[in-house]
Amino acid sequence: MRRFRPLTWLAIGFVKGWRALISPLYGDVCKYQPSCSTYGLRALQVHGVFRATPMIIWRILRCNPWSHGGYDPVPGTPEARQWRELHPETARSKNEPIHDLTDDNPRDHEPALRKSIPGYTDPGSTHTGTPSHTRGEN
């Protein structure tokens, strides 16, 4: 049985209020899937207010014009586990170093990793704009 957590419910109420009152003014501008508010609700429901708050803040900080966006499930959820199983190249352990493109490790030169480099344009791509080209007009 789940216990009543008043701070968590207060935070959930805040996010739902944001979605109802503020979010419609901006339209669909989130670069991530699920949207930042959906991510926040899911994090609060799964982890509670104390563990979810840093996750939500970090997610909001990442949602900026210089970010590529993409699928970003809440850590510790079945969706995140399934994503890691289907896409092991996106998971990083705490001890794994950041990829150094100056060494000759062939794993660093895989197409999926090259595309994650800011400013990288695939030679076969017709896109010449900024990474936020899929956001639409602001």
Curated annotation (Swiss-Prot):
The keyword Cell membrane applies. Residues 123-138 have a biased composition (Polar residues). Residues 71-138 are annotated as: Disordered. It comes from the Bacteria. The keyword Transcription does not apply. Its main location: membrane. It is a peripheral membrane protein. Pfam families: YidD. Keywords: Cell membrane, Membrane. Residues 81-113 have a biased composition (Basic and acidic residues). It is found in: Cell membrane. One of its GO terms (cellular component) is plasma membrane. PANTHER family: MEMBRANE PROTEIN INSERTION EFFICIENCY FACTOR-RELATED. Could be involved in insertion of integral membrane proteins into the membrane. Belongs to the UPF0161 family. This is Putative membrane protein insertion efficiency factor.
